[in-house]
Amino acid sequence: MDQVKEFVTDRRFNPSNSNYGALYSPWINTRDQLAKDQNAKICLPPSGFIAGVYSRIDNVRGVWKAPAGTEAGILGHLGLTVDITEKDQGELNLAGVNAIRTFSGYRTVVWGSNTVSSDIEWRYGPIRRMANFLKSSIYDGIQWAIFEPNNEPLCGSIETDN
């Protein structure tokens, strides 16, 4: 936890510039696939595991669903490098870091969906992701009109999607 706090409070780290980024903690223990010893473990940053959660949630629910909560289980791991307590969770939330937690009698899950933006409009990941999805969908949907005359009939066609 101390390393996370140091990183977030480091003056070189400026989260207000990015509503596209997110931080997750802690690192995750898993099997070392490259080791000769099949029982060898390795500690990895959560990024690959988080990408898997994003992909699974997107496929099952859509980009509007936060990749967090009880559906956002971390798969293929052996444990976390640190057990995040409720108190730790509160501190991480204040710092804009999404916790990965193991709850008693349950599995390990992502328990936060914040971006590192200080802009309240972009604080939550699903908002940014939905905006990106809409922007991309609209852009793709009107490509047919790029070289059409910019006039009232074109605007009417775009509005009715003809």
Describe each region flagged by the PLM:
Residues M1-D161:
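Structured, hydrophobic secondary-structure cores that serve as assembly/anchoring elements
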